[in-house]
Amino acid sequence: MYWLNIDYPTGLWKLHFESCRYCNPSETVRKGVNEFKGHGAWFSFGSFEKAELYFKENRKSDSIWQPCKTCNPKRK
C-alpha cells in the first residue's frame, strides 16, 4: 500500500510506502484522510501507478510530484 501526502501550502505531493517512518496518515483539523481539507490530505493507493495517475489528473499548476527519499517508492 502507498500513501500520498498532498500538502497545499508547499505544493508537494509526496508518495510513501505504508511502512515508511514518515508516513503518518492521520486526520487533523486542516488535513483529511482520503478526503480533502484546507491544507490537503493523505490518500491511499494500491500501486505507484495509481497514485501517479491521480496526481497527473488532479494536480495544480504549482504542484510538485516527489516520491519520498527515505522509503524510495518506485514504479514497477
Task: List PLM regions with ranges.
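Mature, structured domains enriched in cysteine- and short glycine motifs
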Residues: 1-76
